Curated annotation (Swiss-Prot):
Quaternary structure and interacting proteins, as annotated: Monomer. Associates with 30S ribosomal subunit, binds 16S rRNA.
Domain CP-type G, residue spans: 61-218
Lineage, top ranks: Bacteria, Bacillati, Bacillota, Clostridia, Eubacteriales
Protein name per UniProt: Small ribosomal subunit biogenesis GTPase RsgA
Source organism of this protein record: Clostridium botulinum (strain Eklund 17B / Type B)
InterPro entries in alphabetical order: G_CP_dom, NA-bd_OB-fold, P-loop_NTPase, Ribosome_biogen_GTPase_RsgA, RsgA_GTPase_dom, RsgA_N
Cofactor (UniProt): Zn(2+)
UniProt entry tagged with the keyword NAD: no
EC number of the protein: 3.6.1.-
Residues bound to GTP: 110-113, 161-169
Residues reported in the UniProt entry to bind Zn(2+): 243, 248, 250, 256
PROSITE patterns for this protein: ENGC_GTPASE (PS50936), G_CP (PS51721)
Family: Belongs to the TRAFAC class YlqF/YawG GTPase family. RsgA subfamily.
């Protein structure tokens, strides 16, 4: 029978088959092939005496490594607009990770009541201009949860963002229950105490939400090579193949159409600067491998 892994704890996988939840172990053949089932996997299982065994894993449409989550189709990138102030380099990092994993990203700005409408709109425009949808939310009060539930419909949705941004509180509001302990943000350091224990799919509005502890520790330089990075910036897309030199990295090469677009104001210069900084980190990391 077919089902979906919604939780994994200490080698046990909990597979939802229609309305039933079946505790399963994976066949030894997966370990021998260095394949590990992931939360979000669509699987075929056999059941005996109420216990299941995972026989096969269907092809994944996407996968994240930390935490191990498969078949994500949508990401809510949750950032507090204030307390702490939004870190655009960190936001760009999450957006690049979403693009690399072929996951649609929607930026959710939390704590919008702490800033003026003008400041809020300026931040929204800055993000809209690079091609991403922005939604205003107040995780504590539940503001914006209705439209988020509409977006979740039919998707497996991952919440990502820095510690203290309101992810756990938002999950509690979306699921109408205290799914996770919510850490208290330290006023001194402005970071949340991460209290999540494991990854899990939570059913919401004919879709699923995934809690993703540890996602913020991912380093781009660990995931991709220097040739991959430019394809993670949607605003580069129309220019990537029109540079003079094939394989142009949009850095020091002459007659680069991306650099020209930056000079003409068609590409945000701060995003481009983030691209160059990240590119240099990847190149340095590649040197250190050898």
């Amino acid at each position: 029978m077919k089902g979906k892994i919604i939780k994994g704890i200490a080698g046990f996988y909990y597979v939802k088959v229609e309305e039933n939840l079946i505790e399963c172990k994976a066949r030894g053949k997966f370990r021998h092939k260095d394949v590990k089932p992931m939360v979000g996997d669509n699987v075929v299982i056999q059941v005996e005496n109420g216990k299941g065994v995972i026989e096969s894993i269907e092809k994944r449409s996407s996968e994240l490594l930390r935490p191990a989550v498969a078949n994500i189709s949508l990401a809510f990138v949750v950032f507090a607009i204030k307390s702490p102030d939004i870190n655009f380099d960190l936001l760009n990092k999450f957006l690049v990770l979403c693009e690399y994993n072929h996951i649609e990203a929607i930026v959710c700005l939390n704590k919008v009541d702490l800033v003026s409408e003008e400041e809020r709109e300026n931040v929204k425009k800055r993000i809209n201009d690079i091609g991403y949808e922005v939604l205003y939310i107040n995780a504590k009060e539940g503001l914006g949860t209705d439209i988020l539930k509409e977006k979740i419909n039919g998707n497996i949705t991952v919440l990502c963002g820095p510690s203290g941004a309101g992810k756990s509180t938002l999950i509690n509001k979306l699921t109408n229950k205290e799914h996770m302990l919510t850490g208290i943000v330290s006023e001194k350091i402005g970071r949340g105490k991460h209290t999540t224990r494991h990854s899990e799919l939570i059913e919401v509005s004919n879709g699923y939400i995934v809690d993703t502890p540890g996602f913020s520790t991912l380093e781009i330089k660990e995931l991709m090579n220097k040739e991959d990075l430019k394809y993670c910036f949607p605003e580069f897309e129309e220019h990537n193949e029109s540079c003079k030199y094939r394989g142009c990295l949009h850095n020091k090469e002459p007659k680069c159409t991306v650099k020209q677009a930056v000079e003409e104001g068609k590409i945000n210069k701060y995003r481009y600067e983030f691209y160059i900084k990240t590119l240099e980190e990847i190149i340095e990391g590649e040197k250190n491998k050898w």
